[in-house]
């Protein structure tokens, strides 16, 4: 049986005169893009340019909404009510949906950013509000969420198409969550080690945690980051390794 996998990356995170990442190069190697929607990063011109580039390169577009936290790049926890979270979703997804409509591009999915992503994995009322917002804007869009998390299970219960996401360059805890960025084992920097972990997740449905324990995991899409000079070589190494192993790399619009 052939294994399929999507490769996604967070893009469109520049702002005004400030450039972050190497989006044009990253888009040559990934199959799905998570486009920042202006609150943790990005702005209207960046959003439009990113959607246009995705269409030109045949990369699927997803919304990447975050908390309203430019200074903290959306990585700081915020205490928001369910009503606020739902409104945040509608506001940001609605903006990106407009650019998708302009260029006749399907909004394939939604993936939360930073603290919004992590908190929605373990906070039921926040996850519920996020999914309410997604369904309000685009009921057909998929939810790209941390594999095995609460929000993944709730989305499935609602009948929302789910993309179970795993990470090429992050460590996992025994609970299936990501090792916090401030702790040892949070990042996988060696490309070969990362590739071996990705192949185990994709082909065997397992991952080794930071304690050495092996846990089950479902991998529909692998996140690769493109915000540093070594990132392009890292992404290329992962994609070539997957292809050599017989894994078909494609987004969800080309299966």
Model regions and ranges:
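Active-site-adjacent beta->alpha loops and helix N-cap segments on the catalytic face
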Residues: 16-22, 41-53, 121-128, 147-157
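Glycine/small-residue-rich loop that forms an oxyanion/phosphate-binding "nest" at active or ligand-binding sites
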Residues: 69-109
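Flexible, glycine/charged-enriched surface loops at secondary-structure junctions
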Residues: 100-108, 205-216, 248-255
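Conserved, mostly hydrophobic/aromatic
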Residues: 10, 64, 110, 224
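Glycine-rich tight-turn/loop motif centered on a GG-T
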Residues: 19, 23, 33-40, 71-86, ...
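Acidic (Asp/Glu)-rich catalytic clusters
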Residues: 24-28, 49-62, 101-104
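Active-site rim beta-loop-alpha module in soluble metabolic enzymes
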Residues: 148-206
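C-terminal domain-boundary segment and adjacent tail
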Residues: 141, 233-255
